[in-house]
Amino acid sequence: MKKSLIAVALLATIGSTNAATIYDKDGTTLDIFGNIEVGYRNANAAKYDKVSSYNSSDSTIMNTAKIGISGRSQINENLYAIGMAQWDVASGDSFDDLKARHQFIGIDAQNYGTLLFGRGDNAFYTVAGVSDIFHDLDFEVSDYYLTGDQNPGLIMYTLSSLGWDLRASFGSAKSNINNTPLNYKYQFAFSGSTRLKSDITISYALAYYKFSYEGDVRDQVAYFAKKMQNMYHLNDNDILAFANANRPEHKIDKGIAISYGTYGDGLYAALNFVSTRYEHYSHHLYSYEAVIDYAFENGLGLTAGYGCKRFHHTNILGDLNLGVRYGVNANFNLFAEAQIDVNSNPEIYYSHEEITDRALAENKILCGAEFLF
């Protein structure tokens, strides 16, 4: 489970429940926080892990950790400087396996909003994130996770007022987006959400990505060529020339979400729908995610959900997720999750390499324990 850039900003603003304050003087505080996780994963779940590189066909026991630091300093009565950084640490033998998650500094102007600069999720996460509640085996069928997830060079402004939460973000140039050959010149996103008196939240978001093609573009063209070949029924001799002449210059995500309750406090349910349009694609991509969770007062939590991604009237991905967790105390949790393939046809859209590397259309199982600090 991830946290949005704004949600993580709250760690710097008000502190985390498990964070340890290491400095508190003259209106400035500094906290450290994180977790250590050890668990069993079958081979497909191990390949799915984004922190560790795992290519074996065997199940394994894996360990990872997250470490973060956050700070807050009062400038005047209504203005605060905030900062935060968080990293994933895989089970390697050195810090070469360190991966940045969120890194930002910013200004919290209270009633006038929060302005952040750094690395994180763009404003579209307001919609995509309502179903991001599983411990590790998230759906990620939404195409948002290809281009908008945890990007550097991001500027985000958030204003919460009169029952509305408004967010706008702009991202500067980025190469090799999320381990793909794709580059974008810039991106921007906007979202708005409101919580009704019935404890229902409704959200809408839009994101635009301008792709960049500079220097040697063969890998980028090949990435789209493999997808366009199935769309336009092209033979191997024509596909590269076709893809180069019709390479997408932009991508647009539009999404809407509705949720009930607050995750971790009794009943929580959410549904989102995302439409994605690549220039020169024959059809839109559509994704749907629905989740339900119940957190009991004794620390037990049960989660279930279904996610699917469709292209040209066909499910290219379909996953049923089940999860259980138990909080032994505020710092120690046990968890287990399963992701079951439901009539996926990834070969219609994805390349063989993507299907293998991401273990698409494969059943995944994991269980483990984590210690929070």
Task: Describe each region flagged by the PLM.
Residues 326-328, 359-373:
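Outer-membrane beta-barrel "beta-signal"
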Residues 21-41, 56-173, 182-184, 193-196:
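Outer membrane beta-barrel
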Residues 75-81, 111-115, 163-168, 197-204, ...:
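Repeated loop/turn-to-beta-strand initiation elements of outer-membrane beta-barrel proteins
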Residues 71-73, 107-109, 159-161, 192-196, ...:
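Residue-level signature of outer-membrane beta-barrel architecture
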Residues 38-44, 87-91, 119-123, 161-163, ...:
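Transmembrane beta-strands of outer-membrane beta-barrel pores
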Residues 190-322:
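Detector for outer-membrane/organellar transmembrane beta-barrel domains
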Residues 1-20:
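Gram-negative bacterial Sec-dependent N-terminal signal peptides
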